[in-house]
Amino acid sequence: MARTAVVTGGMSGIGAATAARLRADGVTVLTLDISPEADLVADVTDSGAVRAIAAAAGEVDVLVNSAGIVGPNAPLWEVPADGWERTFAVNVRGTFNTCQAFVPGMIARGWGRIVNIASIAGKDGNPNMSPYSASKAAVIALTKSLGKELATTGVLANAVAPAVIETPMNADTGPDALAHITGLIPMRRVGQASEVAELIAWLCSDRMTFSTGAVYDISGGRATY
């Protein structure tokens, strides 16, 4: 059956790799991004814009929430309030906005797949990255709650928790922080966006039928629980 997916943050990094991987599976993909080259141009923090796009997009079967920012790199006591709030606005409120806009249509049709991009930082906490770590912990909790709420509807919601992935977003990660978190990976390398996209593609497919509200680590062995 033909499926349609919306991938937020779909113009770069994990989002772009996921869009390409889903297209290879025959999925019609609409990228949602602030980039003017995206299929759907919007800021995920703007709930009105997201709702308008959802209303105009037609039937959407798959939602991948990949839009995100690293936020401030500093000890918690030096983090500016606006940096904290912006990180939560994009990473958490953006995920909330898109889920709220697209999930009702999936419920009505009795089938859907939602994959939220969290981070291993949301489980372990990265030093000097408290806004990012806390925001990704919130994405994990949101996904667990949503998965339970949808469990009998045919719509499945899961999260992936990558370790460091080679993406443009990590250009905003301080070199000391990047070296520290890369050193925690037993495989001794960063991941590739295409590797994460393989996992996401499975979570978006008909092949995955008995998992919801789960968190899938893709961390090169870093995960501690």
Language model features: what each stretch is:
Residues 104, 148-152:
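Alpha-helical segment proximal to the catalytic Tyr-Lys
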Residues 151, 156, 211-213:
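Short, small/polar-rich loop/turn modules that mediate ligand/substrate recognition or access, typified
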Residues 99, 135, 143:
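Active-site helix of classical SDR
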Residues 74-76, 83-85, 114, 181:
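Substrate-binding pocket helix/loop in short-chain dehydrogenase/reductase
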Residues 119:
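Residue(s) in the substrate-gating loop at a strand-loop-helix junction
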Residues 73, 124, 184, 212-225:
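Short C-terminal tail/terminal secondary-structure segment
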Residues 11-12:
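Conserved glycine-rich cofactor-binding loop
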